[in-house]
Regions:
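Short Lys/Arg-enriched alpha/beta "domain-start" segment
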Residues: 1-83
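C-terminal alpha-helical "lid" subdomain
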Residues: 60, 84-87, 291, 297-351
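Interdomain "pre-motor" coupling segment immediately N-terminal to P-loop NTPase/helicase cores
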Residues: 90-144
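N-terminal pre-Walker A segment at the start of P-loop NTPase domains
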Residues: 147-173
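Short glycine-rich substrate-engagement loop in P-loop NTPases that contacts/grips substrate
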Residues: 163-165, 200, 204-235, 254-255
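Walker A/P-loop nucleotide-binding motif
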Residues: 177-196
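Conserved alpha-helical scaffold flanking the Walker A/P-loop in AAA+ ATPase domains
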Residues: 219-247, 258-268
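Conserved catalytic/switch belt of AAA+ P-loop NTPases
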Residues: 245-279, 283-294
Length: 351
């Protein structure tokens, strides 16, 4: 019998200690040929709870063997299961994400039910969407964080006066369309991010469950194929690139990254009804590569702009919903400004 020995070295840079510990565990199981956790499920929700208190309760359960990574993450080994618990904090709620490995489907479902029982009265049932935010670490490695977001942004037609149809009608048309690409173009403060959030929230309504999106605003994440591969092979409904000026410029000006989007927009992404949304501060339509916004690939290139005084007064009146808007309107007039950003108006009214 001939035996072959293979020697090698593996370099592993650690950004997330919980992932590192899990990978060690999985490697050990694989090398020892143990079939310990053949079933995997995940559980995610948002709730108005104290995240640390929830993880404390899980860690102190006598049936669990916990390894507390930090205040927002926990690894648990219990009878026949391995659980990675993570959370992130928002102002009024927290997002929770559980990766669960078990011996059987029944075991995993019981664990999910037990976790949900602890937070049942505080789970948020309003429409939400999930952002899978991608970024590069200081070690130049791509990482991502999942964040559950409430789809509760105030979106009024008065904020976008150039739409020929209502905003909801426009968004619904985009979601139902075959075209994958939408470009939102305009100066800072004109409501591009708010509109993107409204689109994702509307996707959730169409699905009957939380929509999800790969999100990045980091130029460096677009310089390799990794984030594109993650989107193509993932389950997210949309790919959102904010501040995408560098991505949209003509290829004749040295833009070497756009071809990846052109390829996926016409391929599997379109056939699956998934979407690609760009926001950009580029001032002119001529600043964007024609191939990206051609009919059949791009649903629309939407220009959003600052509001003039009359439009700003109309928006203030609509935002206040019948309340006395006199003081706010007088403030707009006294400012001496000819144009107003949505950001300034929403901030003044605290929306």
């Amino acid at each position: 019998m001939v035996q072959n020995a293979v020697n090698g070295a593996l370099s592993y840079q650690v950004w997330d200690s919980s992932n590192f510990l899990l990978n060690l565990r999985f490697s050990d199981s694989f090398l020892n040929k143990t079939k310990k956790y053949p079933i995997y499920r995940d559980l995610r929700f948002a709730a108005r709870i104290d995240l640390e208190a929830l993880l404390d309760e899980l860690a102190l359960d006598d049936n669990n063997q916990p390894l507390r990574i930090d205040s927002k993450s926990l690894i648990i080994e219990s009878d026949g299961a391995l659980i990675l618990c993570r959370g992130s904090l928002k102002k009024e709620y927290c997002s929770c994400y559980f990766s669960i490995w078990g011996k059987s489907v029944d075991d995993v479902e019981k664990i999910k039910k037990n976790i949900l029982t602890k937070v049942d009265e505080n789970i948020i049932h309003e429409p939400m969407f999930s952002i899978n935010w991608h970024f590069l670490t200081s070690k130049n490695e791509m990482e991502s964080v999942n964040i559950e977001e409430l789809a509760n942004d105030v979106l009024l037609n008065e904020a976008y006066p150039d739409f020929n149809e209502g905003l909801i009608e426009f968004i619904d048309s985009y979601i139902r369309s075959k075209e994958a690409v939408l470009v939102l173009q305009g100066p800072p403060g004109t409501g591009k991010t708010r509109l993107i959030r409204a689109i994702l929230g509307r996707m959730s309504s169409h699905k009957g469950s939380n929509a999800s999106a790969v999100y990045t605003g980091d130029k460096k994440t677009m310089e390799s194929d990794e984030i594109f591969v993650r989107f193509i092979t993932g389950w997210e409904d949309a790919f959102v690139v904010e501040d995408a000026d560098h991505m949209l410029k003509p290829r004749s000006e040295g833009n070497d990254n756009l071809h990846r989007f052109l390829t996926i927009a016409d391929g599997v992404i379109r056939s699956q009804g998934r979407k690609i949304i760009f926001s950009t501060n580029l001032p002119n339509v001529g600043d964007i590569d024609d191939a990206l916004i051609r009919p059949g690939r791009c649903f629309a290139r939407v220009s959003v702009r600052l509001l003039d005084l009359t439009e700003a007064m109309n928006l203030v009146t609509s935002l206040l919903k019948g309340q006395d808007a006199t003081s706010y309107i007088d403030g707009l007039k006294r400012s001496g400004k000819k144009h107003f950003s949505l950001a300034d108006i929403y901030k003044a009214i605290a929306v």
